[in-house]
Structure formats: C-alpha cells, structure tokens
C-alpha cells in the first residue's frame, strides 16, 4: 500500500485509482509547477508554409493550449471536490511541509542548472524562462496570488 500519491492533478490521479491506494494526497505537485501543452513544428517545414498557414497553425496551437488549460482546471476542481466529499475520511489532502518544499526547491534548482548547461539551446531556453519568470513573478504575487489568498480559494 502506498502512503501518499500525487501525479498530475486530482482528475487524472483519480482515473489512475490513486485515491484508492493511498490515504494521503499531497500538494503541490513539485515536479510540475504549471500545466502547459506545446506543439513542436519542424522549423524548415513551418517556414516553407505560406504566411496564412503559419498563422493558422499559430492560432490553432494557442487555441488548443487555452482550451486544454481551461478543461484541466475545471476537471481538477470537480475531482478535488469529489476527493473532499466522496472520499472524506479515506483520503486526507495535505500540503507538503514547508521544510520539504524548501528542500525540493533547492534540489530542483540544482537539477535544472545541471540540465540547462548541457546544450546551447537548453541554456538559451533556461535563460529566457528565468528572465520571464522574474518579470511575471511579482505581478502574479500581487494579482492572482493576492486575490486567491484574500478570497480564500
């Protein structure tokens, strides 16, 4: 028997039956701070397309991302509600302890640094991501984060 489980989010976790195998459901899922989907295109093939077809692919990829993220949020909200009601007393929902989160943050930073230094592209992507994260982090804190903290959701 498992002691605890967390995979992607309660919707997918419940499809796997994790709520039946473990009495504890821990959050946040440290291995995935946000859900995003992406499309990869062969650059040469993409650039060979007419501009209107490139725009079609760009918009289709963006639409699928927005739809998928919205669908993921809605289904996880419903599944979390089910965990709290249908499985009350069988599954306890707990936040990982702060010392554990601090250790995970430190360990993850080391792995990310190591992986980001393996190729020029990895360095470029990591630098871009880190720069953007530093830009939007303060905004997230005063916007969405503050709102959710105040409202209590």
What spans do the regions from the language model cover?
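N-terminal secretory/targeting leader peptides
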Residues: 1-153
């Amino acid at each position: 028997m498992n002691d605890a489980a967390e995979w992607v989010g309660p919707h997918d976790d419940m499809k796997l039956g994790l709520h039946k195998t473990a009495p504890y459901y821990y959050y946040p899922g440290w291995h995935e701070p946000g859900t995003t989907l992406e499309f990869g295109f062969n650059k040469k093939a993409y650039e060979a397309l007419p501009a209107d077809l490139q725009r079609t692919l760009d918009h289709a990829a963006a639409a699928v991302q927005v739809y998928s993220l919205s669908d993921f949020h809605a289904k996880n909200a419903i599944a979390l509600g089910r965990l709290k009601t249908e499985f009350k007393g069988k599954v306890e929902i707990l936040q990982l302890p702060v010392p554990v989160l601090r250790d995970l943050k430190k360990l993850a930073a080391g792995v990310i640094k190591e992986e980001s230094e393996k190729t020029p592209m990895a360095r470029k992507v990591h630098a871009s991501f880190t720069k953007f994260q530093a830009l939007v982090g303060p905004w997230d804190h005063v916007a969405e984060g503050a709102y959710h903290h105040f409202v209590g959701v």
